Amino acid sequence: MSDMFRKSVLNKLPHLPPTRAPWADESEPIEEIDEEDEQLDGIGEFKPATMGPSKHDTQDYSPLSASTFFAQAAEVQPPSTPCTFRVYLTPPNLSIASTNAGTPPGPSGLRTQQQTNRHGTYLVCHHGGGASGLGFAPLAREVKAKGNGEMGVLAFDCRGHGKTSTSDPNLELDLSHDTLLSDFMAIIEMMFPDPKESPSLILLGHSMGAAPVVSAAPELQKKGYTIPGVVVLDVVEGTAVESLPLMKSVLSKRPESFRSVIDAIYWHVTSNSIRNVESARVSVPHIIVPAPSSSSSDPSANPGGKQVWRTNLVGTEPYWEGWYKGLSQRFLRTKCARLLVLAGQERLDRELMVGQMQGKFQLEVMSDVGHYLHEDNPAGLAATLITFWHRNTRVLVLPPKIGAPGPGARGGPVEVKQVGQQ
């Protein structure tokens, strides 16, 4: 790896501020932040923190409830995995989708028709390493708003992350490509067991999450699921593989712990790790856990005090290369619409550059966002996703030839396969 490339990557890293928040004072007692009992829908809420910012900082850094962004949550335990996954979802509004299926004719007299699945369409999101499903919370709300509720959203905490638990703690760090793929497939098949009765699924993966998502698309199509498109967020194989030697250095610059949940939210915002305060308030509480107290080995014994990282990313180092090797080739080979969204002018590797020139995928570049672009600008990404979905599920309705009977005159309507079906 060249020194020029190494310096360019390091220069992109944010200048990390001190871990302690500016209002922290050793002489003042710290009140605990109690977590409310989880409701039947499985979404936990946090009470607003009583420890407020200084008089010079009026920004609210208190945690937000996931119920503000998702309609429901569930604990999913596929029999093929040792994990119980926390799944968040907002179902599509099927009545709205059915009424918006067609468009008026254009100047040429032709019209397009939206291909509709009577079971709706879901955007299925897989987060990156160290994140959680709630990183997609603001995006889920924006997709619902901008898509008039026609598209549902499903996100989850993958193995070793967020609220997902593993029966064998030794398997928490098994984040190999094959394991992530197996877990992802198991969740889909658990949530939508019958491919014929399943909604259409647009698969989206951020960073590490792109690996299982891209690999799952052809496997799900073989099983009969309809996959109209695959979306990859801010990861390019060539750049990712070249950056791996720097990952330990990047991780070592993070604080090892935080004094409180609010301290963690504040750090993520001021370090520019997450540039959207609202998103940080809902996602950060789920990527940290209470540190075990000196008198107890139970991490939940001190919920309002010192916080540590939920996921030991350094422990997953053996799997880093496996996430990204061959990603570009698999992405270009998927038999559905493809969308790559990058943060800033990220350089494409050779395969993606050739693929772009051949028109094999749609490329969108978002400005003024960081690596967590879905958190930094959820409204902008939601608009891109809705347009991508509509563009790739519309079909041209041709008028019948003059004097020829319509399609319903003989043998009923013409059958057209859904986009993404094989």
From Swiss-Prot:
The keyword Transmembrane helix does not apply. The active site is at residues 207, 234, 371. Pfam families: Abhydrolase_6. Keywords: Hydrolase, Serine esterase. It catalyses: [phosphatase 2A protein]-C-terminal L-leucine methyl ester + H2O = [phosphatase 2A protein]-C-terminal L-leucine + methanol + H(+). It comes from the Eukaryota. GO terms for molecular function: protein C-terminal methylesterase activity. Residues 1-27 are annotated as: Disordered. SUPFAM superfamilies: alpha/beta-Hydrolases (SSF53474). Its EC number is 3.1.1.89. Belongs to the AB hydrolase superfamily. Demethylates proteins that have been reversibly carboxymethylated. Demethylates the phosphatase PP2A catalytic subunit. This is Protein phosphatase methylesterase 1. It comes from Cryptococcus neoformans var. neoformans serotype D (strain B-3501A) (Filobasidiella neoformans). The lineage of its organism: Eukaryota, Fungi, Dikarya, Basidiomycota, Agaricomycotina.
